[in-house]
Amino acid sequence: KKIFVAVVQLALRERYQNVKIGILPTYFSFGKAQEKLFSASGIRCKDLRPVGSLRNSIYLDNCQDPLSRYEKNNSLVFISQWKRGLCLNPTNNLYRAWNQGHRRTFQAVYHYAISHSIKLHVILRNTFDHVDNMKHQEKYFMDAVESSEINFLSSKDNELASYPPAYSAEIAVHFLSTLGFEVFGHGRKVLCCIGLGGGKEFVEEFGVQELIEELPKELLLFDDDEGRIDEMITDLRKMSNHDYQSLTKKARNYYMSAEEGKNTHERIQEDISKILYSKKYA
């Protein structure tokens, strides 16, 4: 009996290493970047379908006021990527570099918000494999800036709760976050600061070239220089929405290839139904 297998991408991943499966079945990816990442990892996919983000699509479809996500809000958000193994006593040089880059990005954004009198929200990462993870995550950020006056946003009770603040912020800043790319794909102003992990050398060792190479230079801090974050955020804030949409159109489609006029979750459902019918699985 034939069994149909499909994989749906839910998060960004660096290059795959020591992969035991060389060929993937039908794969619903965020965008075209995944094809290059698979190729660089020595993985072949029989049927790769760039469709955008499933979770983001579900959120937007259920949003009571979809237009609200385009309203300008005078606030910044920092998207946390706190992970226990990376941020709590990292065990190797790569993890330590990642941790420092993530921490320095937050510190720079925090100080920008203070100096420009702008609200800053920190969207916490859901991580519950240890009961004290969220406590350690909050402490990580408070220790980084020696302050407990931080507005943390947690989506513990609602998997989609991280989307509204990311959409409503004037600028979203991240180190290399799935959520950051999701809202970028739908036109929000987003700054990626992966370079603070150690510049080009870190990016190559971490294996994320394919995830950043199509980002416009105005949206990517590739150099190991947190001093540039202040200027880059200011420039993005000053950029008109029309200019921003024109600048990012190609990259948005490259990373989040949602078909215009069709929700990603509906597209996946339709594609699977057609495949099952044509292959006589059903």
Locate the predicted segments by residue.
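Donor nucleotide-activated moiety binding/catalytic core segment of transferases
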Residues: 127-186
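Hydrophobic beta-strand scaffold residues
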Residues: 2-5, 120, 152, 190
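Active-site and donor-binding regions of nucleotide-sugar-utilizing enzymes
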Residues: 1-58, 161, 180
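Short, solvent-exposed loop/turn segments at secondary-structure junctions
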Residues: 10-13, 33-35, 54-56, 81-85, ...
